[in-house]
Amino acid sequence: MSFSRSAADPADTLPDLAATLAAPDTHAFLRLGDAFHTRLPAAPLAAPYVVGFSDEVARLLGLPASLAAQPGFAELFAGNPTRDWPAEALPYASVYSGHQFGVWAGQLGDGRALTIGELPGTDGRRYELQLKGSGRTPYSRMGDGRAVLRSSIREFLCSEAMHHLGIPTTRALTVIGSDQPVVREEIETAAVVTRVSESFVRFGHFEHFFSNNRPDLLRALADHVIDRFYPACRDADDPYLALLEAATRRTAELVAQWQAVGFCHGVMNTDNMSILGVTIDYGPFGFVDAFDANHICNHSDTGGRYAYRMQPRIAHWNCYCLAQALLPLIGLQHGIADDDARAERAVDDAQAVLATFPERFGPALERAMRAKLGLALERDGDAALANQLLETMHASRADFTLTFRRLAQLSKHDASRDAPVRDLFIDREAFDAWANLYRARLSEETRDDAARAAAMNRVNPKYVLRNHLAELAIRRAKEKDFSEVERLAQVLRRPFDEQPEHESYAALPPDWAGSLEVSCSS
C-alpha cells in the first residue's frame, strides 16, 4: 500500500489517506492467503468524536498533526467508511489460537479488531493500522466486538507512555468515542482505539496452525515473519530454530524491562504475546504503586498467575508454547529422513534455546537494576543489593516509582539527605541497614553524587501511568472533557523530566486509589 504525502496541501491528507486505505490491499500479511484472515467491514459507530490523538504517531506515519481536526477523521477511524469499500479492500480480522490462564482455549482470533491497512513510516519501516473495538468478527465468540471508553483511553495512554519509557510496544494513533451504549458490568459507551505496529502476529498465530495440523501454513507464517522482521534468521543453519531463539531473546528482554519499571501486564496469555517482542494488548494492566512482589493488577486473575513476580516465569512458559508450535519446522534443513529422529532432534534443539531464557532475562534485569541504582561499575554483589532493596520495599510497601526516583537524592557521604526516600518506608531501620550497604557500594564508584543522580534520573521515571491518573482522565472524558487525556498524555511523554507544573502527577496515590479495580470486563 502506498501513500502520497503532499506537504503542499495538508488539507488533502485525510481524503488521500481514506482513498489509500479503501484501495485494494496487497500488503504482506494478506498475501499469506484466506486461511489467515477474514475480510469484513467495521460495524457502524454512531456519531463518533475524537477523544485523544497522538501527533507523534501521526508524524511517524508521515501524517500531519492537523489530521485529527480535519472533517471525517472520527468517521474514518471509527471504521464507518469501510462499509462502502470494495470487497478486495475491506479490513480484515486474523485468526489465531492460544493458551489462556494456562489452559488451551482453542481457536480465538481478532474478536473485536480489524486491520484497515499498512502505511510506510518515516523511519523506513511499515506499520499496520488496527481498529480495536470495531465490532463483531467471525472470531468474536460470545462477545459484542466492542471496546469501551475507559479501556480504550487506558490503552491509548499506556501505549504511548511505554514508548516514552523506552519499552518496546505497539503505538496508538487515536481514540474515537461515541455515545453508543454497550453492556458490561454496567452500561458504558463504545470507543475505538487505533493501534499501530509493524505486525500484530502473536504466539497464538503459530499455535493455531500447529494445533490444526497445517505445517504448510505454519511454514508460510514463519517464512513471512522471518523475511519481514528477522531476516538474519534466514542465513542461520536452521532458520526456524533461529526464529525461536530471536523471539525468546526479545521476550526475555522485554519482560526484564517490565520488571524494572514495575509494570504488570495482567493477561499474559499466549495470544497476547507478540512475535516481535513488543508489549501488546493493554487490558487490566497496572504500574505497581506500594510495592508488593505478589501484586496482581487484574481483578479477574484470582489465582495470581500473572502477578508481578510471576511475569518472567510465565513469559518463559509462553516461549515453550511457541517452541511446541514451531517443532514441525525445526530441523527441516538438516535433511534427516527418519521423522522420529528429526522430531527428537527438534525437541533437543528447542529445549536448548528455551534454556537460554534465564540467561537472557537475568543479565538484562541486572543491567537495568544496576542503572536504576546508579552503578556504573559492575560488581558481583549488585544483584543481591538490588534484591535486598526490593525485599525491603516489599516489607514496607514502599512506592516503587518514588523509591527509585528519590534514591538519586541519597548521598554517598551524608546520611542526613536520606529523608525523602527513607520516609517512604514503614521500617526505617530496615531501610537504614540497606542504605549503609548501598553507600558502601557507592564508595567504589568514581562518579560524584551529582553525576550519579543525573544518570539515575535518566532511567528512573518520575511519571508513570498510575491507575488513579488514568481514572481521573476517564471520568472527565465521560463528561466530554478530554483535556485531562491530552494533559496526561503530554506529561507521560517526558517521564524522566522534572515538570514542576505537573508535580501532582508524581505524588503518592490518594487513599481512594486503593479501591480501583481493573479486570478483563472491557
Swiss-Prot record:
Pfam families in the cross-refs: SelO
Matches recorded under InterPro entries: SelO
Binding site for Mg(2+): N272, D281
Enzyme Commission numbers on file: 2.7.7.-, 2.7.7.108
Domain of life of the organism encoding this protein: Bacteria
Keywords annotated in UniProt: ATP-binding, Magnesium, Manganese, Metal-binding, Nucleotide-binding, Nucleotidyltransferase, Transferase
Active site: D271 (proton acceptor)
An example molecular function term from Gene Ontology annotations: ATP binding
Binding-site residues, ATP: G109, G111, R112, K132, D144, G145, R195, R202, D281
Catalytic activity: L-seryl-[protein] + ATP = 3-O-(5'-adenylyl)-L-seryl-[protein] + diphosphate; L-threonyl-[protein] + ATP = 3-O-(5'-adenylyl)-L-threonyl-[protein] + diphosphate; L-tyrosyl-[protein] + ATP = O-(5'-adenylyl)-L-tyrosyl-[protein] + diphosphate; L-histidyl-[protein] + UTP = N(tele)-(5'-uridylyl)-L-histidyl-[protein] + diphosphate
UniProt cofactor(s): Mg(2+); Mn(2+)
Purpose: Nucleotidyltransferase involved in the post-translational modification of proteins. It can catalyze the addition of adenosine monophosphate (AMP) or uridine monophosphate (UMP) to a protein, resulting in modifications known as AMPylation and UMPylation.
Family: Belongs to the SELO family.
Identification of the protein by name: Protein nucleotidyltransferase YdiU
Taxonomic source organism: Burkholderia multivorans (strain ATCC 17616 / 249)
Gene name tied to this protein: ydiU
